[in-house]
């Protein structure tokens, strides 16, 4: 058919405009993100009724199809538009299974345009489906034969629920009287997979059912263990004797499979599994229970820390410490004789001697009354309160000491021989104190409530006294700060009892060595100045005893006045309330007063006048070092934001605390112990006038105790702060004395 020129020109203009519009639409679609639903938006991109065989994806296919259509239109030029016949592009589609509704996985919203439908015009959009057909399960042909079927439930779980992670409730297995051939049928779903194993055999012979069940169980165990081990990332070898499977598989948040089931689990446990978790809270991720490696077991079990060499070392300390203290004290009881003596152990079995000479009822009653009075004063008198993170402490040792000194002075003024009574029964009081330490430790071990809480409601138990060994726990104490009715700290009571006892002994020796003259007859012109001068010129005293007792008094008053510095010490915060601590508190007064007692009984003269000055200077130096270091640490623990700590050097720890590197704490690790040791050496220095071993060994025991405590504190800090303490140790290498210890 022929067309006029005008008609042809109109067709050409129409085709050009149509091509430009389609090109503009294609450019817009190429510039913006494509969605799957955009395939049906253009009139030229309608899907054909027959599927295309072009192997392209959705987005690529959309662009390709659009480009192909535009090219075909441009090639046609001014020719007349024709519609392609559907029969030319018809391709017989291969048989495909019914896939059902496709699950939408895109997070984008659905398009408002309807599904793709064939319009019968234009080229079709080739789309390749990415869904694979399910692989059919091969079936094994069965041989008809007489069958005896026996069903047994194997006690194990093969798979887990994929939606909830919970295990299957049952696992059924049917076994037949043969082990030669078997058919395995697997039924799977979206959530649970259950295996059913059937073994069919020919013949009517008897078959060992237990043997078949055992072989099936072993094979399934190996397959399940291999599957779960591959999922976990670590191969696990299981044996029949060393493997038993749990009812659910827990997923750990750790990669090393050393996390417990409590760490993370997506399963829904039943009642039986909850009982198992209560019995064993730390189980490996591994599906087996008994196939854990020794390395995993060692990581699970936390060994109790050991001090003093275990139970044997603790037993030797409990036996030798009170014996040594009593022997050294007993060796210097007689006048003009302070030397080692032979022990008569048979006296310990003589009940009459112990009753008449040692445990006299009047002396025992006085000692018990003294302890009760000190306890009441500690509980009732006000004191300085120090608020720390874990506990609030009250320190009133100074008030207790002043009260007892005033009461003793009044009693002495009223002609009650308090000083004479105290010094006469010095050795008996030493025995009573050592025995009382064992009694108090036993009472604390058996009767004190171990569930007392501090201000943060945390138990104050001693980890080093929870070993399970009676000797170790009794020696080190199961608690840190037990309290009576939540008010009186037993450790502080024993500490103050030790300080007050030492103070009383020092004042008694000073009072006893001073021989006051009779009261002068004052005239009308003489006043108080004349009276003071009279006593100064006529008083009699022993210089060595007075000097030694004065040094001891100065040493004890320093500890009493600055008692609140104890709140940041190792002794109050970390030392357990055990028998060893109580023995030290009971023995300290008699070890410290051994030198003063020696000078009081031996009457040793001072041969050189500058000796007291050297001793006083050494004592002042030691107390200054001790007090400065303790005060520095106390103020920092109490308020680390103080301006005096603005530019100090510290090491941060993972526990939130800091290790001091400034002041004396950056010079040695325990400067307070260094000052205490120097002060003790000053107390023992007067023994150079007339040496004697028992008093010197008594003070040496306290020095050895401080050295041992420094070692214990270093070990505990190493176990607590780890790498932070390692860095601190590299900078501060010495414990007490630089380049020596």
Curated annotation (Swiss-Prot):
Annotated Gene Ontology cellular component terms: nuclear envelope; nuclear inner membrane
Biased composition (Low complexity): 57-84, 109-126, 185-194
Modified residues (Phosphothreonine): 135, 234, 237, 266, 288, 293
Acidic residues composition bias: residue spans: 267-277
InterPro entries: ERG24_DHCR-like (IPR001171)
Modified residues (Phosphoserine): 111, 144, 223, 225, 243, 246, 248, 250, 263, 284, 291, 298, 640, 642
Gene3D superfamilies: 1.20.120.1630
Membrane topology, as annotated: Multi-pass membrane protein
Membrane spanning stretches: 308-328, 363-383, 402-422, 429-449, 497-517, 543-563, 577-599, 604-624, 687-707
Region Disordered, annotated ranges: 29-126, 160-194, 231-277
GO molecular function, one term: DNA binding
Annotated localization: Nucleus inner membrane
GO biological process, one term: nucleus organization
Pfam families reported in the protein's UniProt record: ERG4_ERG24
Residue ranges, compositional bias (Polar residues): 160-184, 231-240
Protein keywords: DNA-binding, Membrane, Nucleus, Phosphoprotein, Receptor, Transmembrane, Transmembrane helix
Family: Belongs to the ERG4/ERG24 family.
Role according to the record: Anchors the lamina and the heterochromatin to the inner nuclear membrane.
Subunit: Interacts directly with LAM.
Name of the featured protein: Lamin-B receptor
Source organism of the structure: Drosophila melanogaster
Gene name of the record: LBR
